[in-house]
């Protein structure tokens, strides 16, 4: 599938992708800190949570904007919505990894 994204939504999609990338990068930094400097893990995990929340907000706003477009066909709206959901799920999975990592940090510190 190749979703045709309307020009007026390009900035919102770009903002969503940037937040998701920031969440994943914070998760990677958190994982690296687990092996090098365990005290720094918590700071990176907070950043993962922050970026995931931001991506959720942008995702919700974008989905609302998609369904407010009267000139798009329903099938196109559904395709764009699914695309937004899949991109947002990447940030959700990064947060899941960070949550599991926090459990390992607690176990390691005992």
How would you label these PLM feature ranges?
Residues 1-110:
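Cytosolic, long alpha-helical scaffolding segments
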């Amino acid at each position: 599938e190749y979703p045709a994204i309307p020009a007026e939504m390009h900035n919102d999609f770009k903002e969503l992708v940037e937040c998701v990338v920031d969440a994943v990068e914070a998760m990677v930094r958190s994982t690296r800190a687990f092996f090098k400097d365990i005290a720094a893990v918590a700071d990176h995990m907070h950043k993962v949570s922050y970026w995931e929340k931001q991506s959720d907000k942008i995702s919700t706003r974008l989905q609302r904007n998609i369904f407010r477009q009267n000139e798009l066909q329903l099938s196109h709206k559904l395709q764009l919505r699914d695309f937004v959901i899949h991109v947002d799920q990447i940030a959700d999975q990064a947060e899941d990894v960070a949550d599991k990592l926090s459990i390992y940090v607690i176990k390691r510190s005992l």
